[in-house]
A protein has these predicted regions:
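Non-catalytic accessory/interaction domains
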Residues: 1-189
Length: 189
């Protein structure tokens, strides 16, 4: 089906609501948009609908994760990851959050491992994995990035990223005071 997308060149500030058919088609095929701008406008409209209680957060989450598979603009990736995090923590029903967080972190881990080496997107995805890791596989990957036993080609694990990885491990219950003290002694900044 076709997607009727108003303000597709983003020439004005407007809150755009899509018709039901355009919304359904756009969300289902968001990763088929050839350009970042129309995809971003569609997702911004969907996000407004989530915030207004007109679209289930789960539908936005699925579309945002699909868009992250194809998005190449760093600023758009950053915004999508922020909305994904907010969606998981504030807009999904409490009963769905645990499962959704684990599934989202799995997707983010896959994307981080496949991201272009050394790019902003790779770094943003690695940070997002650390922030959402909850399963054994996810926390094992974060711990391996931190200790260097697994590397993502091109990812520089500097002191700032080390802290983000460790914070994620602490939040997931995989690290604690001992690891924090060790990192403090390692941090010469």
């Amino acid at each position: 089906g076709d997607v009727l997308l108003l303000n597709d060149d983003d020439l004005t500030y407007a809150k755009v609501r899509l018709d039901a058919s355009s919304l359904a088609t756009g969300l289902e095929h968001v990763d088929a948009f050839a350009q970042s701008l129309p995809r971003s406008i569609l997702l911004a409209s969907a996000w407004d609908m989530v915030r207004d209680g007109r679209l289930p957060a789960s539908r936005f989450l699925a579309a945002a994760l699909a868009a992250l598979r194809v998005e190449t603009r760093s600023s758009v990736v950053q915004g999508l990851l922020a909305r994904v995090s907010t969606c998981l923590s504030r807009f999904l029903p409490q009963t769905d959050r645990e499962t959704a967080i684990a599934a989202t972190a799995d997707t983010l881990l896959t994307l981080a491992r496949a991201a272009d080496a050394g790019g902003d997107t790779q770094l943003q995805l690695a940070r997002a994995v650390a922030a959402h890791a909850v399963t054994e596989n996810q926390t094992a990957a974060v711990a391996a990035w931190l200790d260097g036993s697994e590397t993502l080609d091109g990812l520089v694990v500097d002191q700032d990223l080390r802290w983000e990885l460790l914070i994620g491990l602490v939040a997931a219950g995989r690290a604690g005071e001992t690891e924090i003290a060790a990192e403090e002694s390692r941090d010469l900044t």
